[in-house]
Amino acid sequence: MLKLFTKLFGTKSERDLKSIRPYVEKINLEYEKLVSLTNDELRKKTDSLKQYIKVETQEFIGELEIRERQLEATTQLTPKEVEDLYIQISRIKEQYNTQLEKVLLDILPQAFAIVKETARRFKENEQLIVTATGYDRELAITEKHIDIEGDQAIWKNQWEVTGHLLTWDMVHYDEQLIGGVILHKGKIAEMATGEGKTLVATLPTFLNALVGKGVHIVTVNEYLAKRDAAWMKPIYQFHGFTVACIEETSPYSAARREAYQADITYGTNNEFGFDYLRDNMASQQEEVVQREHHYAIVDEVDSVLIDDARTPLIISGPVEKGNEQEYITFNPRIKRLYEAQKQIVNQFLQEAKSQMVAGKNDEAGLPLFRAYRGLPKYKPLIKYLSEPGVKQLLHKTENYYIQDNSRMMPEADEPLLFTIDEKHNTVELTEKGLEYITQQGEDPDFFILPDTATAVGEIESDAGLDNLEKEQKKQILAQEYAIKSQRIHAVQQLLKAYALFEKDIDYILVDGKAKIVDEQTGRVLEGRRYSDGLHQAIEAKEEIKIEKASQTYATITLQNYFRLYHKLAGMTGTAETEAGEFYDIYHLDVVVTPTHKPVVREDKDDKVYKTVREKFNAIIEEITVLANQGRPVLVGTTSVEISELVSKMLNLRKIKHQVLNAKHHQKEAEIVAEAGKPGTVTIATNMAGRGTDIKLSPEAKAAGGLAIIGTERHESRRVDRQLRGRAGRQGDVGSSQFFVSLEDSLMRLFISDRIAKIMDSLGLKEGEMIQHSMITRSIERAQKKVEQNNYAYRKRLLEYDNELNKQREIIYRRRRDALLGHRLGAEVNAMLFEVAKSSVMQQGVKANYHVLATKFSYITGTLPPITEEEFHTYDIQKITDIIYQAFLSSYMNRLAVFKEQGIAVQMNLPDHIADIRAEYLSFSFSDSERRLEVPVKIADFMDNAGEAILKSLERVAIIYYLDRYWQEHLRYMDELRHSVQNASYEQKDPLLIYKFESYALFSTMIARANESIITYLLKANLLLYKASDEKPKMVEKNKRIELEESKQDIISLLRERASNSSEEILKPQPIKSQKIANRNERVTVQYEDGTIKENVKFKSVEEDIANGKCILLETR
């Protein structure tokens, strides 16, 4: 059916290209019209397009300005009126963007033609002479390729790029125009190596820069950002666009802010993301560097949106107390445990071998399976599994023990100290293992968490204890629980470090530090640390300095950062295999762009060997033959360890070669430049696959082109395609060949027994191999399975992060409005009402008078304006209005007080205050609990002292308390995500519970922040003031926090934490223990407004519970 559909309507790529080719024809028609124009006339075309865009979108811009003025002008808007205005503004912005995209599509042919004609003129002329503009004169001061002679500007076609003088020699061809259209439409363009992605990006960049809202071009490393910016910027600058690279500026600096104000901004994905987080930690408006996120083009988009999907950007600071000592204390025990397990596994392996030799295959199955469960990567075991019939026996035994929900598995695991599930990358300590690490004389429950529910019940029912003694005992129980929880967590992480993470594969040691190696690229991930204490465990294992634990202050995933953009596009050489994921998660369509010249590279079927030793011997022979033929050879490896192994084997043969891996990355540019010469052998991890272009010498082409040798298949087809793509660029000859053994990880875990049976039946001798298209297809099917599993994990993680992202958007919007001084009156008014409402209501029902009186007195320092009798007589709405009016009256009194104090300060200021260097007056406020420094601009203060003081205090208090509670909330959310994983053991969906609990937690956090802000505003007193030429930071007096930026790998929490069945974290208040019922059970629920529904079926309210609209009280 699919074949018939394809035959009738063509492939997706054919249909995509059919819709794009008309644009190419229009672009070329416009291009022909431009040839006769002078250089000045060509430049004026750009100005006319800018003007056209303004005219066509002016209606919506005018409406937006009216709505914004309404928000700014009115301070007494109700929360409902503010929300309505936000909705109107959002709707107008959507209409504006729709109109804008329509206009841009209309002028696309003209804009693309201008870029192409500019490129042609630079290629065919050594210099372009134009009438000098002010911008030309400004550029000529710093740019060597621009000269000013009288009223003329002379643009040369040579300029410096990363230290080398480059002569422009490129003009866009039709396939690149196709790529440009794809990128402008907000899609992903898959373009083969050497097809000129950097040049393609100039087309949509130019078109979208006409809008004036900024275009961000995102690269995967600093070198590419600087190179591409320097390489392409003269094309843009010639037409009056400003171009900057954020990598050439410092964070927080005025230069960084100016870089974002440029029409076109280059930078790395990490730096764009970190700047967003820094902006949302800024204490002054001048510290904010980014502006609206309008349009971004992401280079190597699959690397950013898929490979880095589990990697959040984090800004963190120190915590008061770390747990480094736990890892130091228990490391020797886990090391002994791991060595003891090795001996046990070796004994089971020898037993299995003996039974097999004796022909007792049935008896050999269990010890073989136990060895596999104990240490699946144990090299003697892997070697033995390549023997005829052994792997089939292992799978047969495994199937027996996993049947009936793994009912028999405890019997198989009983002699082991810990078990490893290699497919899910988890490890779990057994009861025997717990006994092993518990030392003599220690409490037998030293590593077992207490049953708190039972213990609390016993304390409550103990009639011999008074209330104070009960509280003391419960406090001791909670402390014991926390200590044991931390201890067990350290042991679990140490066990993972020993059992699941290998040096020179997962990480390397450099200068006494453990640095993570990216499995996709082979590069060192500078600044990234494994999360949840795992990195500290690895440091303890390697006996290097254990870095201190840190607290998260701000975090965002790259995926959620790029979702901020109105329009997002991407480029890569390998996206088609992940097209489904791009569309499902990011709504990005993948379009394959045709190559300029046909690809003539020969991709050979995989060569499959029985053992790793035979495979590597064959690889060395192949390299020798190819190098002797004068062909350059690129050997792709999956880890640092394998690259060094191949290097040693080549040294024994005295074959000259270069090694490019995470340990030798400094020489990357130099090694790649030499890799295309005849007979050159280059060994590289996957890091040679991106951002590099191996150009062949004429002699190398004549010898047969670049030969790619893959030492094993990667889990991802994309990585293999990246490696193949190094050869055959721009129609060059070349070849690719993968060598595989049955001992490779992918083959062991995911290839069916069928291939092993075939090889056994063929009776292959030492060094012989099989090579067939059927085998290659079977391997690719296995890769698809792994990709599907990884996609499921990434999607699940994204679903968790989406909950936090919704909360982040709310907090950051409120914080940004406060920082910029937008709608402060409306914001404070809304908080006054919410705090009044929460003072009257508790858990959705009317509070008692004592609670109301206590809270009102704490917030205002006065008695409530309502008696207990009135409280019981009036309804909730009336009481709320009374309390709100009292809060509002108190707030207006503060304004009057500050006005009087401000006038007094004004009278004491020197007459020449406006002439001195100071820009701010710094006021100190205190509510007897906390002291804040509040900067007030002198100009605002002199104009209206009281209002200037109050507005500045509002801004400082809102930002201070939002930051304080948000940072605390981030820690709670991380602990929540950890703790809900145990719900899977109760057949409950952890994500559903996480959504419900996180909503309750966020609501409580917002309520606490609002109350703290209002309390401070109503109680804080002015202490002193001073003139200052610096903008004070909004932190507590004498408190300065050193921040650090990092990328932490959350390593698929669902996978990593699945092994922690015995581990449970005490959830911080106010998380409520949420019950979950069966769908047909009768339940009682309470809604936010206090309404209680009794005896309803759980399935009828399940959605409301998931959305946080109600809470489950009991089941029947």
Curated annotation (Swiss-Prot):
Its EC number is 7.4.2.8. One of its GO terms (biological process) is intracellular protein transmembrane transport. It is found in: Cell inner membrane; Cytoplasm. PANTHER family: CHLOROPLAST PROTEIN-TRANSPORTING ATPASE, SECA INNER MEMBRANE COMPONENT OF SEC PROTEIN SECRETION SYSTEM. Monomer and homodimer. Part of the essential Sec protein translocation apparatus which comprises SecA, SecYEG and auxiliary proteins SecDF. Other proteins may also be involved. Belongs to the SecA family. Part of the Sec protein translocase complex. Interacts with the SecYEG preprotein conducting channel. Has a central role in coupling the hydrolysis of ATP to the transfer of proteins into and across the cell membrane, serving as an ATP-driven molecular motor driving the stepwise translocation of polypeptide chains across the membrane. This is Protein translocase subunit SecA. It comes from Amoebophilus asiaticus (strain 5a2). The gene is secA.
